[in-house]
């Protein structure tokens, strides 16, 4: 059996890894071993943070809605607001409610008054 020296294949594989790591800083973009390690770390982080992003945005929307609902009324909170929303069968998700609360507070007040009464 003939000996395979892997010249072309190895170069092509390393070039692919270098292109991925070209924006990394220092040895992380130049040395082959560290680029492969950093590539693995980057892929793991991106996979983890794709699911974390959904959590973070939901938390941000809830915080914004809670802040606006507590502004006017003394004993009114986010949990009561959402409970009344479901009770009245109004189909507005948290993202839309947060956008309304930020951009058009009058509209949000109309919605909350409609829910309470």
Swiss-Prot record:
GO cellular component term, pick one: ribonucleoprotein complex
Subcellular location: Plastid, Chloroplast
InterPro entries noted in UniProt: Ribosomal_bL20, RIBOSOMAL_L20_CS, Ribosomal_protein_bL20_C
Highest taxon in the source lineage: Eukaryota
UniProt keyword list: Chloroplast, Plastid, Ribonucleoprotein, Ribosomal protein, RNA-binding, rRNA-binding
One MF annotation (Gene Ontology) recorded for this entry: structural constituent of ribosome
Primary localization class, coarse: plastid
GO BP terms, alphabetized: ribosomal large subunit assembly; translation
Keyword hit for Disulfide bond: no
Pfam family, one: Ribosomal_L20
CDD domains assigned to the protein according to its UniProt record, in alphabetical order: Ribosomal_L20 (cd07026)
Family: Belongs to the bacterial ribosomal protein bL20 family.
NCBIfam families: rplT_bact
Function: Binds directly to 23S ribosomal RNA and is necessary for the in vitro assembly process of the 50S ribosomal subunit. It is not involved in the protein synthesizing functions of that subunit.
HAMAP family, per database record: Ribosomal_bL20
Name the record gives this protein: Large ribosomal subunit protein bL20c
Species the sequence originates in: Phalaenopsis aphrodite subsp. formosana
Annotated gene: rpl20
